[in-house]
Amino acid sequence: MKLKKNDRRVAIKEAIELNPFITDYELCEKFDVSIQTIRLDRTHLNIPELRKRIKLVAEQNYGRIKSIEANEIIGDLIQVNPDVSAQSLIEITIDSVFAKSEIARGHVLFAQANSLCVALIHKPIVLTHESQVEFKEKVKLNDTVRADARVIDITDKHYIIEVNSYVSDMLVFKGKFKMYYTSEDE
């Protein structure tokens, strides 16, 4: 049963508040209406499109990082809990894929994961010491990749960070990064 317009708009607003990264396509499937209807409803509710919502969340998080400038992060930093965990999103664009196959270049996924590891560590200097990575599935043009990083160990000079990257719920990249750091007093 379809919702009436006002009820649907309330439900759309609640769905976006619950998950600011939900796409218009996911909303149109959820509410069984056209994508144009979702866009009109969002406009009526003064809710920006997904890209703008991601940028707003990312801008709020950039002030919480110490080791890297915001413009050096590959992707948009959507969540950071310094020295614990972080998330970023990247949309795979035409300049990130091979022309013939439209499959994402591996270094894009690696760069997203690696820069997320650097951003996550709340120290002035952070460098990659070593990494072990696996590319699990193909990532294609227009896919949105969510990278989740979490610290699994800390030693005198290194953080060990695990990164899993997903397209929707499908694991596409897995990595373990050993990151070297220096403290303020060094």
From Swiss-Prot:
One of its GO terms (molecular function) is DNA binding. Keywords: DNA-binding, Fatty acid biosynthesis, Fatty acid metabolism, Lipid biosynthesis, Lipid metabolism, Repressor, Transcription, Transcription regulation. One of its GO terms (biological process) is fatty acid biosynthetic process. InterPro entries: HotDog_dom_sf, Transcription_factor_FapR, WH-like_DNA-bd_sf. Transcriptional factor involved in regulation of membrane lipid biosynthesis by repressing genes involved in fatty acid and phospholipid metabolism. Belongs to the FapR family. This is Transcription factor FapR. It comes from Staphylococcus epidermidis (strain ATCC 35984 / DSM 28319 / BCRC 17069 / CCUG 31568 / BM 3577 / RP62A).
